[in-house]
């Protein structure tokens, strides 16, 4: 398998982060509300993984190195895993598995609805991220996977609604996300491979 070392590094890194958070929770190092801290960190981790997934194509075009594309799907699946853990942690630590409380939460915190929409879209991408689905869906596969752009927008909106007044960190992620979207505009995307082939550029 090509780039196995890169795939292994992504696997170990993505696995180590939540494992470390769980260890911190075990030793009471996550503050007075470790459950909420875990929910927040898993959500932020999912957003970071989504941005990394979207960064792979521009990086490949700029560098010409195919290794970036080799881990793109893996990063996307880890993003889904983090979202699933984020949702599970919310149900356990915030709701306390009290499903009757969910209706109240939805009415008081509509950002949860935004997050759920993003989860449903990401679920569709996760279950179709395989060769069988690509063959079965044909040209519709690419159209379906453009949902990733909607997912990014929903993720940023979800985070904005959660942080509210503390916009400094959110702005950073929003700028990175907007930049990655700009790099996908046809007029810009066509120029990326040329940047590495210009005289004087190594």
Curated annotation (Swiss-Prot):
Its GO CC terms are: plasma membrane
Co-factor: note:
Binds 1 FMN per subunit.
Q: List the disulfide bonds.
A: none
Q: Keywords assigned by UniProt?
A: Cell inner membrane, Cell membrane, Electron transport, Flavoprotein, FMN, Heme, Iron, Membrane, Metal-binding, Transmembrane, Transmembrane helix, Transport
* Location in or out of the cell: Cell inner membrane
Which GO molecular function entries does the Swiss-Prot or TrEMBL record give?
electron transfer activity; FMN binding; heme binding; metal ion binding; oxidoreductase activity, acting on diphenols and related substances as donors
Query: Which superkingdom, per the lineage?
Result: Bacteria
Topological type in the membrane = Multi-pass membrane protein
Needs which cofactor?
A: FMN; heme b
- Major subcellular site: membrane
Q: Which GO terms describe its biological process?
A: protein repair
The record, for InterPro entries, names:
Fe3_Rdtase_TM_dom, MsrQ-like
Q: Which residues cross the membrane?
A: 8-28, 42-62, 75-95, 110-130, 147-167, 169-189
| Subunit relationships | Heterodimer of a catalytic subunit (MsrP) and a heme-binding subunit (MsrQ).
Q: Cite the HAMAP family for this sequence.
A: MsrQ (MF_01207)
Family membership, please give it: Belongs to the MsrQ family.
Query: What role does this protein play?
Result: Part of the MsrPQ system that repairs oxidized periplasmic proteins containing methionine sulfoxide residues (Met-O), using respiratory chain electrons. Thus protects these proteins from oxidative-stress damage caused by reactive species of oxygen and chlorine generated by the host defense mechanisms. MsrPQ is essential for the maintenance of envelope integrity under bleach stress, rescuing a wide series of structurally unrelated periplasmic proteins from methionine oxidation.
The record, for NCBIfam families, names:
PRK05419.1-2
What is the name listed in the Swiss-Prot or TrEMBL entry for this protein? Protein-methionine-sulfoxide reductase heme-binding subunit MsrQ
The organism is: Pseudomonas aeruginosa (strain UCBPP-PA14)
Its gene is msrQ
